[in-house]
Amino acid sequence: MSSLATTAGAVTTLADMVPRHDRVLPVDEALASLFPAAGLQRGHVIGCSGSAATSLALAVVARAATAGAWVAAVGMPTLGVEAAAEAGVPLARLVLVDIDESQPAASWAERVGAAADGFEIILTRPPHGAERMLRKVQQRLQARGVVLVAVSDAANDVASRQGRLACDVELATFTVEWLGIGTGHGGLVGRRVSVTSNGRRSPRPLRAELWLPGPEGRPGRVG
């Protein structure tokens, strides 16, 4: 925990150089139509679920990180830095934070709270058992103006975990097709994903067809 506190302190100093008056952090133009404000509003919770949840979450934070925002990935041990880089996230702006698996819920809440002091975006997968802590965590993030991007691979898990986070925007993904698979051979070069955006900040469902990733390796709009 001390290492995270040191990192957060250093990041806070650097983050002071980034204007905080801008209430909306940028997203890639391919994703902008999925957000009511065409970007990430500070203090909001974004839920990503379904077959391409992690890929979408990385795409969501990439543009803001490129623009200078710091991203903490808390409790996501399977998140690969190579995948993050391929999604466009500058690794110099990404810090991976482990949680104590012997007491995951308490450790998760503690690490997220500490990260809120120095990071503008927190990417995380809330562990089972954290439900009773979610409201307090969310209130702290809102007070700090931190964007929380919560990931769930199961589409129906968004209601049980992310739903209790009171997501401002919920992005559900469904893989439509993979590109590059021949007749029993060939490498995968792209994935077409259908994304639906709902949430308490969305007056109506919003939909988009995206490449996650596209043939060039980066996210993009289909068509």
Label every model-predicted segment:
Residues 38-41, 114-116, 142, 185-188:
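Solvent-exposed alpha-helices and their adjacent loops that cap or buttress functional pockets
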Residues 70-139:
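Long, charge-dense
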Residues 1-73, 199, 223:
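Detector for small/aliphatic-rich hydrophobic stretches
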Residues 153-223:
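Phosphate-binding/switch region of NTP-binding enzymes
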